[in-house]
Amino acid sequence: LFGKSLEWAGVKKEKATLYGGIGSLLFQTYVEVEDGFRASLGFSVSDEVSNFIGAFLPFFKEKFPTLKIVNFKMSAFPSEKFKSGAHRFIVDDYESLYFWLCFDVAEILKLKQLKFWAFDIFDLAIGYSVKEIDWRGNGKRELFLSLDYDLSKIPVRIWFLKQIFALLNYYHLPAPTLQLTPRLKFFIVKI
């Protein structure tokens, strides 16, 4: 979002994605360092590595176009802990958060010859979440396989609408989903 804001301000895309990555990483590192001072959380090296990857993925996609087949998204759905008031903000409740690695199936399978854009917007996503997290960071890991949508591929000519679609593309929208672990379960729609 930092990079997109810089683009809107007239900064060239390559520089905007670099500066956006730096700004994003600084903010996320601040949050991670703050977690380090909380006994119930602590600093997490794996979280910081994930922060780096997420912050600089747009920059690396500009430098290495083959990476455009992959996208990271997130979604949130209030957990029982959040509903009970254990957290003020949903982003502080890791049990409410889902992280998705999305793949551009049409690009991977070289289906670009399809002339109808509606086929091109469907992607495949692998999702991850954790429930019943304890103070040591242990919990029940959940793995999902889901349909995903690449809204940026919907052909629109209105600039503002394109920007809305680009913003929504950071989030995994409700879709049919198969939960793989801890037990196999199908959801007609999962956030």
Model-derived features: positions:
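Hydrophobic alpha-helical membrane segments
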Residues: 1-191
